[in-house]
C-alpha cells in the first residue's frame, strides 16, 4: 500500500461569493488496486468541500478530484481562509497523505458618484463670484480604494477641489467642484459637465451631469438725471414760453418805431 497527494496550486484568490477550485492529484504507489477515503478539514465558514468522498485507483496509477472553497460574501479584501487540509487514506488504515491549501479574498472595486441630498445638479453663479458644488463619492467595494478624479466637458472656470481621495469600504466622502466664472462666461447658456472617477484597478465611473447657469454681474454706472417739463411748456420744449415772450416784445418795439 502507498499513496501520494499534490494540488495544482497551494493558494488561490477569489472575490466574495466566488468559488476557488483546487485540483488534487492522488497516486496509488502500491502494487494493487486501492480505494482511498478523502477528507477535508478547514474553516467551515468557507465551506471547503471535496467533489467525492472516496476514489478507487489501480496499482501504480493516478487519478484526480476537486476541492472547492467558497469565499464568504462579507469578507474584506485580503481576508484568508487559513489552512484547509485535504487527506487521502488507504484502505489499509495506515497509509495516508495530506496537503494544505488556502484561499484569500480579492478586492472588489465598485465606485458610485451621486448628487448630494437636496441638490439636483444645477446651480446658478454670478460672473466674478465663487461657488462650490459637491458630489457624494461612495466606495461599494470590499477594500480601501484610492480614487482619482478628472473633469469632462468642463468650462475653463470650473476646477476640482481634490484630484484624489482615499475612501474606505462602505464609506462616502464629498468631492468639491469650484466654480469661478469671469465676465467672459455667457449669461443664458447652460454649461454642462461631468466628473470621471478612476479606481485603483483602472475602472471608471462617470458622475451624473452638473449644470452651471450664469448671471451677469451688475456694474455701477453714473446716475442719470431726468428733467421733467412743466405742462404749460409749449411743445414740451424747455424754455419755449420764454422764447415766445421775447418774440412778442420784439414785435411791439418794432411797431412803435414805425409809428
Region locations from a protein language model:
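Long beta-sheet-rich domains in secretory-pathway and surface-associated proteins
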Residues: 1-259
